[in-house]
């Protein structure tokens, strides 16, 4: 399936995967504006007595995906009503409070997303109307860092809109020209904003979008990342955006993005590192042909998600990401578990189409029970190996398999290592077996073991207990080594 939103050109203002919000009816925003020291947004606010920021009550209705859309819509309504002071006040509050939604998403980042995201298929007039509103915001509150970052992110989105989502060789000369002009406009706005007394974590993220659009060299992009992380270490979007910048279709080579995720997570270390590893992976996974994601460690991604849910709470949007990751790694037990928790709440930002979501959900349902049984057997085999005498018994079974391997090696040239799971019965016969990699040698070994069972042979030593499972990692090269010995 083609990745419609990220496979060729990203929409840097867009958050690829929606994160969680509350599930109950909540007051979206009701707080007191902070004094100038916490991030002033306009001269008038600095000189006057702080007033409360009031926004309409939002009913999240039990679905965090819908709740997040409602959150963005409420902010968009304030923009259209030209409630610029209220918008500045809300942003100041979220900057200073560093609050997050369930699932770990920063409210500040969602604030910018809600205002700058144009839904559906926006026309040239739609972009121009939104840009004019943002420009009036800048004009009305010239000291607002928020207004300038919003306007800059709108220009980066408008720039990618001109380029389109096709491959680079299909972009018109006009498209390239508009991309360049609008990215330069965004950079100019951000440069101007950097001189303001108030600072904002989103400024660096917006500049990373410019870096991607203008094709900055790696050294320059890394320096920007370094400055961003120094300003706000926990604003994980910086790491995500840089990983995307390192994707092969942009400025990196195969393996660069996954290597960056690993190095970043290891440098931070501990649970925080594992959590960041998942957050970066969530940016790279896509319902498309993107091999880079499969270079990530699935066990570490799972660990990171578990920590994220424990720390920030459950999010249907996050569960959509976990299900997508599990599908990529063909861990159908994990996928089935995630789909059951998701229900019918498909996040199209993750799956691109509801049809694909339903297809994968059905596959996971069919394969999940079988995968869960397989996982339980593998765990039992691991326990057997660690038990008293387990390692010695497994070695004896591997030795007993050498004649089978020698027979198979004589009929094919496959020398790839493979994994074979075997259940040994009480008398030393093979009662069950399957391979985990469909190599030629593995398939030949399965036929040989099956023939042995049909003949009621007992090629293995009597196991320590009944129905004894082993997870065998076999190397065809051991056949020649054994022969030499």
Give the positions of each predicted feature.
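N-terminal secretory signal peptides that target proteins for export/translocation
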Residues: 1-17
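Bacterial N-terminal signal peptides
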Residues: 20-33
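Signal peptide processing junction and immediate N-terminal pro/mature segment
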Residues: 33-44
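Short coil/linker segments at helix-helix boundaries
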Residues: 43, 69-73, 78, 85-143, ...
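Compositionally biased, long intrinsically disordered regions
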Residues: 46-80, 86
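Extended alpha-helical scaffolding segments
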Residues: 311-352
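C-terminal non-catalytic interaction modules
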Residues: 323, 361-376
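Charge-biased low-complexity segments
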Residues: 370-485
């Amino acid at each position: 399936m083609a990745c419609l939103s990220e496979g060729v050109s990203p929409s840097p203002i867009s958050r690829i995967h929606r994160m969680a919000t509350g599930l109950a009816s909540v007051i979206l925003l009701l707080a007191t504006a902070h004094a100038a020291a916490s991030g002033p947004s306009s001269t008038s606010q600095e000189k006057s007595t702080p007033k409360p920021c009031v926004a309409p009550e939002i009913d999240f209705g039990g679905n965090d995906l819908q709740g997040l859309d409602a959150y963005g819509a409420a902010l968009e309504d304030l923009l259209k009503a030209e409630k610029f002071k209220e918008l500045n006040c809300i942003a100041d509050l979220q900057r200073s409070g560093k609050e997050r939604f369930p699932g770990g998403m920063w409210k500040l980042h969602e604030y910018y997303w809600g205002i700058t995201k144009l839904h559906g298929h926006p026309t040239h007039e739609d972009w121009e109307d939104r840009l004019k509103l943002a420009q009036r915001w800048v004009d009305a509150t010239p000291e607002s860092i928020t207004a300038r970052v919003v306007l800059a992110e709108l220009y980066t989105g408008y720039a990618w809109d001109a380029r389109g989502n096709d491959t680079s060789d299909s972009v018109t000369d006009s498209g390239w020209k508009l991309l360049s002009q609008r990215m330069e406009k965004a950079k100019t706005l951000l440069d101007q904003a950097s001189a303001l007394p108030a600072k904002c974590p989103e400024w660096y993220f917006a500049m990373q979008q410019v870096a991607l659009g203008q094709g900055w060299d790696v050294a320059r992009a890394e320096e920007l990342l370094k400055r961003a992380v120094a300003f706000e270490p926990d604003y994980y979007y910086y790491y995500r955006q840089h990983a995307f910048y390192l994707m092969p279709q942009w400025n990196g080579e195969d393996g660069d993005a996954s290597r960056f995720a690993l190095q970043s997570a290891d440098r931070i270390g501990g649970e925080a590192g594992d959590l960041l590893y998942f957050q970066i992976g969530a940016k790279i996974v896509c319902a498309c042909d993107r091999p880079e994601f499969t270079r990530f460690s699935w066990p570490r991604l799972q660990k990171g998600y578990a920590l994220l849910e424990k720390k920030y709470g459950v999010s249907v949007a996050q569960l959509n990401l976990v299900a997508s990751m599990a599908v990529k790694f063909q861990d159908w037990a994990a996928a089935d578990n995630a789909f059951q928790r998701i229900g019918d709440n498909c996040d199209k930002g993750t799956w691109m189409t509801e049809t694909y979501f339903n297809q994968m959900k059905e596959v996971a349902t069919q394969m999940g029970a079988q995968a869960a049984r397989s996982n339980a057997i593998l765990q039992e085999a691991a326990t057997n190996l660690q038990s008293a005498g387990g390692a010695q018994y497994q070695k004896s079974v591997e030795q007993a398999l050498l004649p089978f391997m020698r027979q198979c090696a004589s009929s094919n040239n496959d020398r790839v290592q493979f994994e074979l799971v075997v259940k040994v019965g009480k008398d030393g016969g093979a009662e069950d077996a399957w391979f985990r990699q469909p190599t030629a040698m593995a398939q030949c070994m399965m036929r040989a073991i099956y023939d042995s069972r049909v003949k009621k042979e007992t090629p293995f030593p009597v196991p320590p207990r009944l129905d004894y499972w082993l997870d065998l990692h076999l190397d065809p090269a051991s056949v020649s080594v054994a022969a030499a010995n």
